[in-house]
UniProtKB/Swiss-Prot annotation:
GO molecular function: structural constituent of ribosome
Matches recorded under Pfam families: Ribosomal_S8
InterPro entries: Ribosomal_uS8, Ribosomal_uS8_sf
GO terms, biological process: translation
GO CC annotation terms, alphabetical: mitochondrion; ribonucleoprotein complex; ribosome
PANTHER family: 40S RIBOSOMAL PROTEIN S15A
Keywords noted in UniProt: Mitochondrion, Ribonucleoprotein, Ribosomal protein
Location within or outside the cell: Mitochondrion
Keyword flag Ribonucleoprotein: yes
Record protein name field: Small ribosomal subunit protein uS8m
Organism: Acanthamoeba castellanii (Amoeba)
Major location (coarse): mitochondrion
Length: 127
């Protein structure tokens, strides 16, 4: 299991158990994804404890998790790459969510990658 998949699994369990914080393994990719989630207001923040661990401060709105659903799209066994023209088709109009992509400009949301007109590896889908 990749570190990103492991982090998402721990975050899901933390939200289901109503924890205020969870601890995950440290990696550059996880820090970049957490930075995007923090910037968009889906977590209260994160603290890099040491070289091995990150504490994620989970966010609740009216006693409900800020993240309704989070899913890993690209796995080590099956990478999913999207061109910027295909991004709109990937999310249906009913979805209020967004994608997090790994691009040549770094970790971006689908809106940001559309602005830059670049595609990339689809990492996560968040509602």
């Amino acid at each position: 299991m990749s570190l990103l998949s492991n982090m998402i699994s721990i975050v899901k369990v933390g939200y289901n158990a109503r924890h205020l914080q969870v601890i995950v393994q440290n990696s550059k990719l996880c820090i970049n994804v957490l930075s995007v989630l923090y910037k968009l207001g889906y977590i209260r923040g994160f603290i890099i404890k040491d070289q091995k661990n990150i504490t994620i401060l989970l966010k609740y709105i009216n006693n409900k998790p800020a993240v309704r659903n989070i899913a890993v799209i690209s796995t080590p066994g099956r990478r999913t790459y999207l061109k910027h023209k295909k991004l709109e088709k990937f999310l249906t109009k009913k979805d209020s969510g967004f994608l997090i992509l790994s691009t040549s400009k770094g970790i971006l949301t689908d809106e940001e990658s559309n602005m830059f007109k670049i595609g990339g590896e689809a990492l996560l889908k968040i509602n």
